Swiss-Prot record:
Protein name, per record: Pantothenate synthetase
Recorded metabolic or biological pathway in which this protein acts: Cofactor biosynthesis; (R)-pantothenate biosynthesis; (R)-pantothenate from (R)-pantoate and beta-alanine: step 1/1
SUPFAM superfamilies recorded: Nucleotidylyl transferase
Organism from which the protein derives: Cupriavidus necator (strain ATCC 17699 / DSM 428 / KCTC 22496 / NCIMB 10442 / H16 / Stanier 337)
InterPro entries: Cyt_trans-like (IPR004821), Pantoate_ligase (IPR003721), Pantoate_ligase_C (IPR042176), Rossmann-like_a/b/a_fold (IPR014729)
Biological processes annotated in GO: pantothenate biosynthetic process
HAMAP family referenced in this protein's UniProt entry, alphabetically: PanC
Length: 282
């Protein structure tokens, strides 16, 4: 596996590779990331990964400086997965001058849910993903469904800019107790780690309530509020538990709900100092 930091060297290395499958990451790789590499191999060849902790998507009170950076360990994991190239640029490599041009998602998708609680987050995500796409020029890119809103935003960005890239969604990888794998799980204390699977169980409770209700009389807002209250009683600080349409992450109208519109439940909540996100399709 070649480890490359220069944009030009990456382009030179991939010249003529018109079926490359790309997996962008911020490093600190776990089994969830490695499953993305395996899925990428099913859809393209060679597999190209990137590791870059993108300052643009971190807010002023977020964990950019303490975000775990484990490059040597990550390299060993990617080598075992048969990744062809790892693009691991420095901040100077990616942004040799101030990044004055940004890619901003539409407000109806970028300023809701995560965007409401992390202003500017998706602008930073879209900007770096667009730049990474420009660097790697892949035919396929794989994004995990754990970051459901990010997946939707990247997919729409690719459509809007007519980029010749297929976006492949990857299922969330979970621990045996249901907790979605995340680099931030390492911040949990032992007691918090024992409590953390409650977030996924709460999503299942919401799904069971929705599926078991009479749709004509169901009150989705009340279901959401009850789920937040349940988490709060256990010591969580929930930002949202929200039932949305899968197609555009907007709240379903009563008519859409009655017609059986495919839905997804999304949540974000703090447990101690650690903010966890998860989702479950209905």
């Amino acid at each position: 596996m070649k480890v490359i930091s220069s944009i030009q060297e990456l382009r030179d290395q991939l010249r003529g590779q018109n079926r490359a499958a790309f997996v962008p990451t911020m490093g600190n790789l776990h089994e969830g990331h490695l499953s993305l590499m395996r899925l990428a191999r099913q859809h393209g060849d060679p597999v190209v990964a990137s590791i870059f902790v993108n300052r643009l998507q971190f807010g002023p009170n977020e964990d950019f400086d303490k975000y775990p950076r484990t490059l040597q360990d990550d390299i060993e994991k990617l080598q075992k997965e048969g990744v062809y190239v790892l693009f691991a640029p420095s901040e100077r490599d990616m942004y040799p001058e101030p990044q004055e041009y940004r890619v901003e998602p539409p407000h109806d998708l970028g300023d809701i849910l995560e965007g409401e609680f992390r202003p500017g987050f998706f602008k930073g995500v879209c900007t770096v993903v667009m730049k990474l796409f420009s660097c790697a020029q892949p035919r396929v890119a794989v994004f995990g469904k754990k970051d459901y809103q990010q997946l939707m935003i990247v997919r729409r960005m690719v459509q809007q800019f007519a980029l010749p890239i297929d976006i492949i969604p990857a299922e969330t990888i979970r621990a045996e107790d249901g907790l979605a794998l995340s680099s931030r799980n390492r911040y949990l204390s032992p007691d918090e780690r024992a409590e953390a699977p409650v977030l996924y169980r709460t999503l299942h409770d919401v799904r069971d309530t929705v599926l078991g209700s009479d749709r004509a009389s169901a009150d989705l807002l009340a279901v959401e509020a009850n789920a937040k209250e349940s988490l709060a009683r256990r010591g969580w600080k929930p930002d949202y538990v929200s039932i949305r349409k899968r197609v555009d992450l907007q709240a379903p109208t009563r008519e859409e709900f009655l017609a059986g519109e495919p839905l997804v439940i999304l949540t974000a909540a703090k447990l101690g100092a650690t903010r966890l996100i998860d989702n479950l399709e209905i």
